[in-house]
């Protein structure tokens, strides 16, 4: 549903979706770290009553805990609310990205070492711009910067097998 589809009263408060996979569905193979590492198209839609100054996205793999002993961070992205609605996390040049657990800045696709894993995409609408956030930030730095500033959050999950 988009703003064009109805009035503000009928728009969900804050949702995250992907054009590449449905909630709980299979993330495309070419989005995998070793199979093209293509960013999935992630989109945020929100009710205009949320006057967010910025948005953040965290993609991680809680299933990695059993394989590597930690929740693996695959993507950290932050962007100001300076683009047309809906907000997309695939437009280069308007995002500040953090460092993944692969040691790289930007998107690092699924790479489960053992079995099918579930990946969690968490989106946050933020009250203010996190102007001090610099490229290469960690998940902890992003979470610390967002503390007390989250207006709304949404979650999308997808699976990927080796």
Show which residues each predicted segment covers:
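N-terminus-centered regions that define maturation/targeting leaders and the start
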Residues: 1-162
